[in-house]
UniProtKB/Swiss-Prot annotation:
Residues the record lists as Pyrrolidone carboxylic acid modifications: Q1
Protein name (database record): Cytochrome c2
Main location: periplasm
Protein modification: Binds 1 heme c group covalently per subunit.
Matches recorded under Gene3D superfamilies: Cytochrome c-like domain (1.10.760.10)
GO CC aspect terms: periplasmic space
Similarity remark: Belongs to the cytochrome c family.
PROSITE patterns linked to this entry: CYTC
Single GO biological process annotation from the record: photosynthesis
Location in the cell: Periplasm
InterPro entries: Cyt_c-like_dom (IPR009056), Cyt_c-like_dom_sf (IPR036909), Cyt_c_1A/1B (IPR002327)
Residues where heme c binds: C13, C16, H17, M79
GO molecular function per UniProt: electron transfer activity; heme binding; metal ion binding
Amino acid sequence: QQVAAGAVSFRKCTPCHNIGEGATNKVGPVLDGLEGRHSGSIPGFNYSEANKKSGLTWDKATFKSYIADPRAKIPGTKMVFAGIKNEKEQEDLWAFLTQYGPDGKKK
Protein backbone atom coordinates (compact mmCIF):
# COMPACT_ATOMS: atom_id res chain seq x y z
CA GLN A 1 0.00 0.00 0.00
CA GLN A 2 2.78 2.39 0.89
CA VAL A 3 4.56 1.76 -2.42
CA ALA A 4 1.30 2.22 -4.36
CA ALA A 5 0.65 5.52 -2.58
CA GLY A 6 4.23 6.55 -3.30
CA ALA A 7 3.71 5.79 -7.00
CA VAL A 8 0.82 8.26 -6.98
CA SER A 9 3.00 10.87 -5.23
CA PHE A 10 5.78 10.27 -7.76
CA ARG A 11 3.52 11.73 -10.45
CA LYS A 12 4.47 15.13 -8.97
CA CYS A 13 8.10 14.28 -9.74
CA THR A 14 7.76 12.99 -13.31
CA PRO A 15 7.96 16.38 -15.04
CA CYS A 16 11.62 16.45 -13.93
CA HIS A 17 12.66 12.91 -12.90
CA ASN A 18 12.66 9.38 -14.32
CA ILE A 19 13.03 6.06 -12.53
CA GLY A 20 13.14 2.43 -13.59
CA GLU A 21 14.83 0.41 -16.32
CA GLY A 22 15.96 2.58 -19.20
CA ALA A 23 15.42 5.83 -17.27
CA THR A 24 17.35 8.86 -18.47
CA ASN A 25 18.12 12.22 -16.91
CA LYS A 26 15.58 14.96 -17.54
CA VAL A 27 15.51 18.39 -15.89
CA GLY A 28 16.43 16.42 -12.75
CA PRO A 29 18.62 13.32 -12.40
CA VAL A 30 17.49 9.71 -12.64
CA LEU A 31 16.36 8.47 -9.22
CA ASP A 32 17.36 4.80 -9.58
CA GLY A 33 19.38 3.50 -6.64
CA LEU A 34 18.71 6.59 -4.55
CA GLU A 35 19.18 4.94 -1.15
CA GLY A 36 22.85 5.18 -0.16
CA ARG A 37 23.77 7.32 -3.16
CA HIS A 38 25.76 10.53 -2.72
CA SER A 39 24.07 13.74 -3.78
CA GLY A 40 25.41 15.03 -7.07
CA SER A 41 26.76 11.69 -8.28
CA ILE A 42 24.76 10.65 -11.38
CA PRO A 43 27.08 10.68 -14.42
CA GLY A 44 26.05 13.05 -17.18
CA PHE A 45 23.77 15.20 -15.05
CA ASN A 46 24.66 18.87 -14.64
CA TYR A 47 24.23 19.34 -10.87
CA SER A 48 24.48 22.64 -9.06
CA GLU A 49 27.70 23.18 -7.13
CA ALA A 50 25.52 23.17 -4.01
CA ASN A 51 24.35 19.61 -4.68
CA LYS A 52 27.81 18.37 -5.61
CA LYS A 53 29.34 19.85 -2.46
CA SER A 54 26.47 19.07 -0.05
CA GLY A 55 28.10 15.90 1.28
CA LEU A 56 24.67 14.28 1.58
CA THR A 57 24.12 10.56 1.30
CA TRP A 58 20.49 9.68 0.64
CA ASP A 59 18.77 7.81 3.42
CA LYS A 60 15.19 8.12 4.63
CA ALA A 61 15.79 10.94 7.11
CA THR A 62 17.87 12.98 4.65
CA PHE A 63 15.32 12.46 1.88
CA LYS A 64 12.41 13.48 4.09
CA SER A 65 14.08 16.70 5.20
CA TYR A 66 15.10 17.47 1.60
CA ILE A 67 11.75 16.73 -0.02
CA ALA A 68 9.96 18.83 2.63
CA ASP A 69 11.89 21.92 1.48
CA PRO A 70 14.66 21.27 -1.05
CA ARG A 71 16.06 24.82 -1.08
CA ALA A 72 16.29 24.94 2.71
CA LYS A 73 18.15 21.60 2.88
CA ILE A 74 20.55 22.44 0.03
CA PRO A 75 20.69 26.20 -0.49
CA GLY A 76 21.59 26.80 -4.12
CA THR A 77 20.01 23.61 -5.47
CA LYS A 78 18.50 23.82 -8.95
CA MET A 79 15.44 21.92 -7.75
CA VAL A 80 12.53 24.36 -7.91
CA PHE A 81 9.91 22.00 -6.44
CA ALA A 82 8.13 23.58 -3.47
CA GLY A 83 8.31 20.38 -1.43
CA ILE A 84 6.08 17.76 0.16
CA LYS A 85 5.24 18.72 3.73
CA ASN A 86 3.03 15.73 4.61
CA GLU A 87 5.13 13.16 6.46
CA LYS A 88 3.06 10.16 5.34
CA GLU A 89 3.43 11.23 1.72
CA GLN A 90 7.19 11.62 2.24
CA GLU A 91 7.37 8.07 3.67
CA ASP A 92 5.25 6.67 0.83
CA LEU A 93 7.41 8.35 -1.79
CA TRP A 94 10.59 7.01 -0.15
CA ALA A 95 9.10 3.49 -0.16
CA PHE A 96 8.33 3.83 -3.87
CA LEU A 97 11.76 5.21 -4.80
CA THR A 98 13.78 2.68 -2.80
CA GLN A 99 12.22 -0.31 -4.54
CA TYR A 100 14.49 0.51 -7.51
CA GLY A 101 18.14 -0.49 -7.53
CA PRO A 102 20.96 1.37 -9.32
CA ASP A 103 20.21 -0.59 -12.52
CA GLY A 104 16.59 0.57 -12.49
CA LYS A 105 15.26 -2.90 -11.70
CA LYS A 106 12.93 -3.46 -8.78
CA LYS A 107 14.73 -5.14 -5.90
